[in-house]
């Protein structure tokens, strides 16, 4: 038996429609998009553009401003380094994934970029004030996660976007844990949205998206063949070409398209309700066990993620015991040094993350086994 509750890392299983779309894409799209005028290349180009349109419509963007990336980390690096290429001040939150924190820290160390970290609180107004208090005349970008990959806490990103809009500051949002689970649109005030294709969007690994409203220029961090302006040694200055050097993840893009269509057909509210119902049931069961620490605050809102610890047992040791029974959960520090520093965890946490295909019965059985582990200290 293997039960996957590590869907915050990548969703599994994938919808049947995604699996079928992948099989179909491998059979049909054997050309290279934008590289050739023959039938295979043209058919593949049309399919890639269709995937781009689907993603653009889903996030309220224009297709030409919708860029396929290798993953969310790639998209965030393009956005952060591209927007901050001329220097300036940037602000990130204290719950950021290393996909934001590391490129930001590297820029602050090596270039004319200064960095501030805004503390996140359970209370949204306190969090917004935390960001507001750090804004300077030189602030060029605010980068924050929509939802923490450790606890699932949803940041007041729409209010943070208002701060940015009033001051002409670029707002870059990390949607890896939110997109496909809650509705996220550029009309929320986001200038550049970066997300993964293989998590809530149900695509395959090796896929990500950068979606821009086109208001802030993004200097390319990589140059190469784009299928356009091939006679010039200069990188194209228009999207998506400026940020899509080399062959894009064509087959992966087909999977993301199918995943988005699955979400639209199923209903994003229904997906969230199912996953959050499982989380609330799991929390209810854990709350009955003495010595279980659950990292959720009543005042905050969350996507369907629950971080917890079993007494003083190191999180990775506890997770390994659960894995022996067939339960897949991520433990440790979740590539989020800042978040765990704020939480004050000594050995990280165990992260429970269901998907639309998860079962409340399996979650209840896991909670029951957690109780046995807590009481015995072993499986």
Please give the residue ranges for each predicted region:
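Pyridoxal 5′-phosphate
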Residues: 1-379
């Amino acid at each position: 038996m293997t039960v996957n509750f590590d869907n915050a890392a990548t969703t599994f299983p994938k919808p049947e429609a995604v699996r079928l779309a992948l099989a179909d894409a491998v059979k049909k799209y054997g050309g290279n998009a934008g590289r050739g005028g023959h039938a295979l290349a043209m058919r593949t180009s049309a399919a890639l553009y269709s995937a781009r349109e689907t993603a653009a419509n889903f996030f309220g963007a224009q297709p030409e401003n919708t860029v396929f990336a290798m993953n969310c980390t790639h998209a965030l690096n393009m956005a952060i380094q591209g927007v901050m290429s001329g220097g300036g001040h940037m602000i990130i939150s204290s719950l950021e994934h290393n996909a934001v924190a590391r490129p930001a820290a590297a820029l602050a160390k090596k270039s004319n970029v200064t960095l501030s970290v805004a503390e996140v609180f359970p209370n949204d107004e306190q969090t917004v004030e935390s960001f507001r208090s750090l804004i300077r005349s030189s602030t060029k970008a605010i980068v924050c996660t929509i939802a923490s990959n450790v606890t699932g806490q949803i940041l007041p990103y729409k209010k943070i976007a208002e701060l940015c809009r009033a001051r002409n500051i670029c707002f870059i949002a990390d949607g890896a844990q939110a997109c496909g689970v809650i509705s996220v649109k550029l009309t929320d005030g986001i200038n550049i949205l970066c997300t993964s294709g293989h998590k809530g969007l149900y695509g395959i690994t090796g896929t990500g998206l950068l979606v821009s409203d086109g208001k802030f220029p993004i200097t390319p961090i990589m140059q190469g063949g784009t299928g356009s302006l091939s006679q010039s040694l200069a990188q194209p200055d228009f999207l998506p070409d400026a940020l899509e050097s080399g062959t894009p993840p064509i087959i992966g893009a087909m999977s993301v398209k199918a995943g988005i269509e699955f979400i639209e057909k199923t209903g994003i509210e229904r997906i969230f309700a199912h996953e959050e119902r499982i989380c609330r049931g799991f929390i209810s069961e854990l709350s009955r066990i003495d010595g279980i620490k659950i990292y959720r605050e009543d005042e905050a809102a969350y996507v369907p993620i629950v971080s917890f610890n079993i007494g003083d047992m190191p999180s990775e040791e506890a997770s390994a015991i659960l894995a022996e029974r067939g339960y897949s959960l991520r433990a440790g520090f979740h590539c989020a040094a800042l978040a765990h520093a704020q939480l004050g965890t000594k050995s990280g946490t165990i992260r429970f993350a269901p998907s639309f295909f998860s079962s409340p019965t399996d979650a209840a059985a896991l909670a029951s086994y957690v109780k046995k582990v807590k009481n015995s200290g072993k499986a």
